[in-house]
Swiss-Prot record:
Chain residues that bind (2R)-2-phosphoglycerate: Q163, K337, R366, S367, K388
Cofactor: Mg(2+)
Name by which UniProt lists this protein: Enolase
Gene Ontology molecular function: magnesium ion binding; phosphopyruvate hydratase activity
EC number(s) on file: 4.2.1.11
Involved pathway(s): Carbohydrate degradation; glycolysis; pyruvate from D-glyceraldehyde 3-phosphate: step 4/5
Length: 428
């Protein structure tokens, strides 16, 4: 038995300089697991609750001392002595202890920090790398990365309404080459922007944040960077967008202020479809407002056979909402963010439900990250096939890519990289 003998929560900083929660879990053997939780900027209204102090005299009200206190007192009193290897039992204990449908009492940032730290401790105790602890001998597929090389929307202070413009190196033979491909495109894009007198400062997720005139112009420049780096768009590299449409949906219309457009749901579906006809776009995330289910039905009907339509704010890693979407034929993919739901067990349940329904699952970071690389291990352990963890800069993003390199090295010849086949539910 891997009995938990001590648990310590603390307030640390994330990549935006805002407080977040870190947790240490100590086992009877002396083994320790440590984990830190991320935080989002554009958030779905149905996400599990991130508990903040609200004390304006500390960190502008964003302190997390209440969540830390919940770990050090109430959660500690409940889980001390429990077996760390019983992840599902421990997570359900946390869920029941909280007693709300959205972790509002203890805070999802408290429950997730504990859940992750327990898993790390148990893996260490078992002498297993974390990805192997999660997935057993079956976890051997490296994910295709969605690399966010241009930031807009809530992630940057510029004129772009679409939040993320990403490249996906689907033509690579392995993850190592995919990472190199993304990095070379990133640096080529930097050269192009500098040559045009545009700023090469980066946004929250490490991508560039220039003031392009339109989404179309941004995509054209990215295509130029792909070619300049020596790759073929549409073959070696595909494109992906995160619209974060909930951020610019007002009064029943989609307001693309950077382009002076106000579009209905159907018109915005057509707008995105037109972009996909002009550029090799394979994935569109949150193409509709989280509550615009009629809009989601429309875009799924129009684009769902050829484009991966990812629900982030739509599904918030919640199996109850995902099941409703599956039953109604809404979207065809789910974004998996561990802090949207607050425990690893619930996270794995969402991934499994998606796979059973022939939906893809994309493991994701948040815009406020830490050096914690757990999501890299989750991506491989669950054979999710895709990961979204930012650009090719900022150490909080690179930490995940570097962990995936280590995992690929550890797996050796049994490691696989799916490339285009990861879009198994599309007809392209």
């Amino acid at each position: 038995m891997s009995a938990i003998v001590d648990i310590i929560g603390r307030e640390v900083l994330d990549s935006r300089g805002n407080p977040t929660v870190e947790c240490d879990v100590l086992l009877e053997s002396g083994v320790m697991g440590r984990a830190a939780v991320p935080s989002g900027a554009s958030t779905g209204s149905r996400e599990a609750i991130e508990l903040r102090d609200g004390d304006k005299s500390r960190y502008l009200g964003k302190g997390v001392l209440k969540a830390v206190q919940n770990i050090n007192v109430e959660i500690a009193e409940t889980i001390l002595g429990l077996d760390a290897s019983e992840q599902a039992f421990l997570d359900h204990t946390l869920i029941e202890l909280d007693g709300t449908h959205n972790k509002a009492r203890l805070g999802a940032n408290a429950t997730l920090a504990v859940s992750m730290a327990v898993a790390r401790a148990a893996a260490e105790e078992a002498g297993l790398p974390l990805y192997r602890y999660f997935g057993g001998s079956g976890g051997m597929q490296l994910p295709v990365p969605m690399m966010n090389i241009v930031n807009g929307g809530a992630h940057a202070n510029n004129s772009l309404d679409i939040q993320e413009f990403m490249v996906m190196p689907v033509g690579a033979e392995n993850f190592r080459d995919a990472l190199r491909c993304g990095a070379e495109i990133f640096h080529e894009l930097k050269k192009i922007l500098a040559a045009q007198g545009m700023p090469t400062t980066v946004g929250d997720e490490g991508g560039f944040a220039p003031n392009f005139k339109s989404n179309h112009e941004c995509l054209q420049i990215i295509m130029k960077a792909i070619e300049g780096a020596g790759y073929q768009a549409g073959e070696d590299v595909l494109l992906a967008l995160d619209c974060a449409a909930s951020e610019f949906y007002k009064d029943g219309k989609y307001h693309l202020s950077g382009e002076g457009l106000q579009l209905t749901s159907s018109e915005f579906s057509d707008y995105l479809g037109n972009l996909a006809d002009q550029f090799p776009i394979v994935s569109i995330e949150d193409g509709m407002h989280e509550s615009d289910w009629d809009g989601w039905a429309d875009i799924t009907q129009k684009l769902g056979k050829k484009i991966q339509l990812v629900g982030d704010d739509l599904f918030v890693t919640n199996t109850r909402i995902l099941k409703e979407g599956i039953d109604k034929g809404i979207a065809n993919s789910i974004l998996i963010k561990i802090n949207q739901i607050g425990t690893l067990t619930e996270t794995f349940a969402a991934i499994e439900m998606a796979k059973r329904a022939n939906y893809t699952a994309v493991i994701s970071h948040r815009s406020g990250e830490t050096e914690d690389s757990t999501i890299a291990d989750i991506a491989v352990g669950t054979n999710a096939g895709q990961i979204k963890t930012g650009s090719l800069s900022r150490s909080d993003r690179i930490a995940k890519y570097n962990q995936l390199l280590r995992i690929e090295e550890d797996l050796g010849d049994v490691a696989t990289y799916p490339g285009k086949s990861v879009f198994y539910n599309l007809k392209r």
